[in-house]
Regions:
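Acidic, divalent-metal-binding catalytic cores of TOPRIM
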Residues: 1-183
Length: 183
């Protein structure tokens, strides 16, 4: 007799791969925060996993894409928007999208700026004040300290409403867009 089984239903719960550990930390922290406070009855239906960056050349990017297929049948990656302007095709995010398009079976790429053109990187979801305090550089120690403070502080004012609303907007967009993707 089996006392407990764990099943993963990708139609109800998706894995979203993110570029790095700080992105993972911020997104996972807000997911836990919202699930405990606002979405207890309808938790956010995805888990974030970091992929250690987009890599530096097309071959390495394509190796990463192949590895993602080993982890998930329908990989979804949330990437920054590294373009300096709309015409910047040399940005790493654009190179990654091109490398993906060259694959026989491309993965799904979600770009932050498609949610809101102000969101070029995860840190842009923070208000100016919160960014200065918690996300001024991509430092994992700062991100971990933020996680501890947000999740374990009894205070509800660790971050401002603008920051909460921005992350909520991002999560709602991810839920909406992933519901359009067939598993």
């Amino acid at each position: 007799m089996v006392s407990q089984n764990v099943f993963h239903n990708p139609q109800k719960h998706r894995t979203i791969f993110v570029e790095g550990t700080t992105d993972y930390c911020y997104l996972s922290t807000f997911k836990l925060y919202f699930n405990e406070r606002e979405f207890k009855n309808n938790p956010i239906p995805f888990t974030f996993l970091p992929i250690s960056g987009l890599k530096n050349d097309s071959n390495e990017m394509q190796k990463t894409i192949k590895k993602l297929y080993e982890l998930d049948n329908n990989p979804i990656v949330l990437i920054d928007d590294d373009r300096k302007c709309d015409f910047d095709q040399n940005a790493k995010s654009e190179q990654f999208k091109r490398a993906n398009e060259e694959m026989p079976d491309p993965i799904t790429i979600l770009q932050l700026s498609s949610c809101d053109n102000r969101f070029k990187q995860i840190e842009d979801c923070f208000s100016a004040n919160d960014r200065e305090e918690y996300a001024k550089n991509k430092c994992i120690e700062l991100a971990m300290a933020f996680k501890t403070r947000l999740l374990y502080s009894e205070k509800d004012d660790v971050v401002g409403e603008e920051t909460k609303n921005n992350f909520k907007k991002l999560f709602e967009w991810i839920v909406w867009i992933t519901n359009l993707i067939k598993c």
